[in-house]
Design a protein with these regions (language model features):
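Short loop immediately C-terminal to the Walker-B catalytic DE motif
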Residues: 18-19
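GG-anchored amphipathic helix commonly corresponding to the ABC/SMC/Rad50 NBD signature/C-loop
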Residues: 1-14, 24-31, 35-36
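C-terminal lobe/lid and adjacent interdomain/linker elements of RecA-like ASCE P-loop ATPase modules
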Residues: 24-44, 49-99
C-alpha cells in the first residue's frame, strides 16, 4: 500500500501509520521510508511505535512536557515499556493483572 502511494522527493506528514500494521509490516514500512529518504523525501510522523521510532538518525520530539524536547530513542516511554514487557513478560502481566 505505502509503496504505491509514495513518490520520490516529497514531504510526508503521517499520523500513526502503524495503526493498521503488524510489526512485520512496520519493518517493511521502514524500508520503504528509507528508500524514499534516500531519494530526497522527508517524513514527519506522529507515532507510538517503537519500531518506527527506531529509524536511524530520526529526530524524536516529545510533546509530553511543557516544552517540546528532542529525546533519545532509548529514553522514550514507548521503547522502555516495550523493552521491559518483552524482558519481563510474566512479572509485568502478574503486576498488571493482579486484582
Amino acid at each position: 500500500m505505502f509503496a504505491n502511494r509514495f513518490q520520490d522527493s516529497a514531504l510526508y506528514l503521517l499520523d500513526e501509520p502503524e495503526a493498521a500494521l503488524s510489526p512485520q509490516r512496520q519493518l517493511t514500512f521502514l524500508k520503504i521510508m528509507h528508500d524514499l529518504a534516500n531519494e530526497g523525501s522527508q517524513f514527519i510522523i506522529a507515532t507510538h511505535s517503537p519500531i518506527i521510532l527506531s529509524y536511524p538518525g530520526a529526530a524524536i520530539l516529545s510533546f509530553d512536557g511543557e516544552e517540546i524536547q528532542e529525546v533519545d530513542y532509548e529514553a522514550t516511554d514507548h521503547y522502555q515499556i516495550t523493552k521491559y514487557f518483552l524482558n519481563n513478560r510474566e512479572s509485568f502481566l502478574n503486576k498488571l493483572l493482579d486484582d
